[in-house]
Amino acid sequence: MISPGFSHFTELAQQGNFIPVYQEWVADLETPVSAWYKVCSSQPYNFLLESVEGGESIGRYSFLGCDPMWVLEARGDETTQVLRNGQTETFRGNPLDILSQCLESIRPVNLPQLPPGIGGLFGVWGYELIRWMEPRVPVYEPQPEDPPDGIWMQVDHLLIFDQVKRKIWAIAFADLRGENVDLETAYRNACQRVTKLVLQLQLPLPPEATALELLTKTQLEGKELNYSSNTEQEKFLEEVAIAKDYITAGDIFQVVLSQRLSTIYRDDPFKLYRSLRLINPSPYMAYYNFGHWQIIGSSPEVMVKADRQLDGKLMATVRPIAGTRPRGKTHPEDEQLAEELLNDPKEIAEHVMLVDLGRNDLGRVCVQGSVKVNELMVIERYSHVMHIVSNVVGELASDKTAWDLLKACFPAGTVSGAPKIRAMEIINELEPERRGPYSGVYGYYDFEGQLNTAIAIRTMVVQEQPDGAHRVSVQTGAGIVADSDPQKEYEETLNKARGLLEAIRALS
C-alpha cells in the first residue's frame, strides 16, 4: 500500500513543497544487482550504492536510481544543467555555488519512518574542484577527453534496500514547486512513479543479466593484464626524491604522489562493478553511470559525513586511513603483518599527522570543544590489504551546513598531504596530469541536509572509446614522508591497485 494517503499528504503539503510518497515491502529474494538490471540498465544516467562495512560485514542500506530530474556537469568555468526533458542551461562561475542554487527552491518534508538518503544529489566531486575552494592551488585545465570536474544527478525517485530487515522502499517525491500546482495531480504522479518501480521489480531479468563468470586463480596463473602508466617507474622515483627534498627544506611534512594505470576492456562496464564487489568489497561500493563514462568505486575511506541527530543537530565525521600492508596468506601471517604495521614508526607518525589534520579540518566548522577522536589506530582488513584507521567526530556549528563541512575538509589529507595547500602545489608540479575523479569524492547529499561521501580511491574511471571498447583507469597514491623509500612507495601504489586490476583480469 502506498503511503501517505492523500488526506495525510494534503496536511504534509503545509510543511514543504517536496513530499516523499512510498511503498515498502519484504523482499528477501531480490538483490540490489538484480534490481539494477530491471530498473536502471536501460537508462543512460543511473547509480547503485552498496556497502560492505570494514570490508567484512554487509552495510545496512543500498541505494539505486535512474532518470534524474536534472544532471549538473561542471567543466572548467562552465557548469551545464540538463533537465529531464532535454532542456539545457549553462552557467559560469563557482559550480559549488551553482549546485546550492539549484537546490534552493526545495523545501523537503521529512518522514521519520523512512531511511536516510531517500533522495537528493548523487554524484562525483572531482579533485580539480579545489580551484574553487582554494584559488591559490594551481590545477591542470580540462581537456575534451577528460571527465568533468564534477557531475551530479538530482534524484526524485529511487529504491532503497534494507539488508537488515530485508525490506525494499520504492520512493518518489511529489513536487509542489511552482504556481497553481494541483495537489491531487502531483500526488497521483508520485504514486504512478512508485507503482512503476514496484512493477519493474516484478519483471524477469533482462537477457544481459547473465551469471557472472570469473576466472579462477588457477585459470589466472600466468595470465597478465596489459596496462600502461601515465608515468615511468624511474620518473616516479625521481618525483619521490624531489618530494623528500621539499620535506627536508621544511615546506611540507608529507605529500601523496600517485600514478594512473590504464587498460582496455571490451565488455559491459556493469560487469566490472559486479566483479569488483566480489573481489574487492568495501564500505563504499559505487556504480555511477553518466552515459558514455562510468565511475566504479570500492573506496574504504569516508571523506566526510554529516548525520542529522534526533535533536536536529548535524554530527560531522572524518575517518582517516593511513598505513598499509598486504593481507597475509594465513591467519598467523595476517596477525603478524598487522602487529608489524602498528609498530612501524613511519606509519604511526604519518597516521597521527593525518588524524591531527582531520581534527583541524573539523575544527574550522564544528562547535568549539566538540571535536574528538573516538577511535584511534585500529586495523581494518580488506580483501587485499589492511589499513590503520581512526575516527574523528564533531558537532557542526549551527551556522554551518554540510556544504561548509565538505569545503573545509576537501580534499582529504590522506590523498593530498600536510600542510594541505603546499602539498597540493607540489602535486601539481610533480604529477604529469590532472587527477580528475581520483582523490575527489563520490556520494550523496540528501533532502535532510545530510552528506555521505567517500574518497575516490580504489576507483575505476571507465570511458567509452570510438571503437566501442572502454578505457579503464585506476589511480593510486603513496604518502611520501622524510624517511620514505622511493622503491617501496612505488610498490605501494601497485599494491593498492592490485584488487581493482584483479577484478578486470578475472573477466578477461
From Swiss-Prot:
Top EC class for this record: lyase
GO MF, one annotated term: anthranilate synthase activity
UniProt binding sites for L-tryptophan: S51, P283, Y284, M285
InterPro entries: ADC_synthase (IPR005801), Anth_synth_I-like (IPR019999), Anth_synth_I_N (IPR006805), Anth_synth_I_PabB (IPR005256), Chorismate_C (IPR015890)
Binding locations of Mg(2+): E350, E492
Catalysed reaction, written as an equation: chorismate + L-glutamine = anthranilate + pyruvate + L-glutamate + H(+)
Keywords of this entry: Amino-acid biosynthesis, Aromatic amino acid biosynthesis, Lyase, Magnesium, Metal-binding, Tryptophan biosynthesis
Annotated chorismate binding sites: G323, T324, Y438, R458, G477, A478, G479
EC number of the protein: 4.1.3.27
Highest rank taxon of the organism: Bacteria
Pathway the protein takes part in: Amino-acid biosynthesis; L-tryptophan biosynthesis; L-tryptophan from chorismate: step 1/5
Cofactor note: Binds 1 Mg(2+) ion per subunit.
GO biological process, one term: L-tryptophan biosynthetic process
Ways its activity is controlled: Feedback inhibited by tryptophan.
Family according to the record: Belongs to the anthranilate synthase component I family.
Protein task: Part of a heterotetrameric complex that catalyzes the two-step biosynthesis of anthranilate, an intermediate in the biosynthesis of L-tryptophan. In the first step, the glutamine-binding beta subunit (TrpG) of anthranilate synthase (AS) provides the glutamine amidotransferase activity which generates ammonia as a substrate that, along with chorismate, is used in the second step, catalyzed by the large alpha subunit of AS (TrpE) to produce anthranilate. In the absence of TrpG, TrpE can synthesize anthranilate directly from chorismate and high concentrations of ammonia.
Oligomeric and partner information: Heterotetramer consisting of two non-identical subunits: a beta subunit (TrpG) and a large alpha subunit (TrpE).
Protein name as annotated: Anthranilate synthase component 1
Natural source organism: Synechocystis sp. (strain ATCC 27184 / PCC 6803 / Kazusa)
Lineage: Bacteria, Bacillati, Cyanobacteriota, Cyanophyceae, Synechococcales
